[in-house]
Amino acid sequence: MLKFRLILTVLTVLLITVNGQFGVNIENKSSTSSSKSAASKPSGNFAIPTALRRPNPFLQRLPSAAADQEALFQSKTAQAQPQPSAQSTNKPSFQNGQQSGGNQPMYPNQPDPYQTGSYQGPYNSMNSNNNNPPTMAGPVPADRISYQPAPKNTVQSGYQQPMPGQQSMQVPNNGPSLPAGPSYDLHNQYPPQQN
């Protein structure tokens, strides 16, 4: 134990001595180097001499690349501009039900239904014979109506809820009548709640 303390003390003294010597030397060297560098530095912002600068190829290519891009843009815009012609018009013309010029119809192989009078109502995917465009124009013929809204089961719609086992009561505005027996709420499409 005594030997260990003695060795530790000797090492500590040596470390302090060496550190002091190197610290003095470092301070002396740093002071002399700082004085030399201060004398060699020019006043103001230090700029790299032009002869020492390495040329940047990207900066040298910029003007030519911009010119190439501009030439390419001009050529594309010249190609995109439509050439004027004597027959060019924006208004569509109909001949024998076929549309020419302007916006083309959705089904170019079929006559225009609005011009030929062959329009038969809205598009119905269940009817294979109806190939008209899925658009709506004018009144729909009665035989083409596939949806009839259910009347509301209220007094305002023309009839009252019948009592069980009785016929439905007509109201003054001649609305449709409901059959006798249990009925459903046609407006909400839900069965009545059973208590």
Curated annotation (Swiss-Prot):
Tissue-level expression: Component of the acid-soluble organic matrix of calcified layers of the shell (at protein level).
Glycan attachment sites: 28
Chief place of localization: secreted
Disulphide bond pairs: none
Location of region: Disordered: 26-195
Subcellular location: Secreted
Annotated signal peptide: 1-20
Composition skew (Polar residues), residue ranges: 112-123, 151-176
Ranges of Low complexity composition bias in the record: 29-43, 74-104
Lineage of producing organism: Eukaryota, Metazoa, Spiralia, Lophotrochozoa, Mollusca
Protein name: Uncharacterized shell protein 22
Keyword entries, A-Z: Glycoprotein, Secreted, Signal
One cellular component (GO) term of this entry: extracellular region
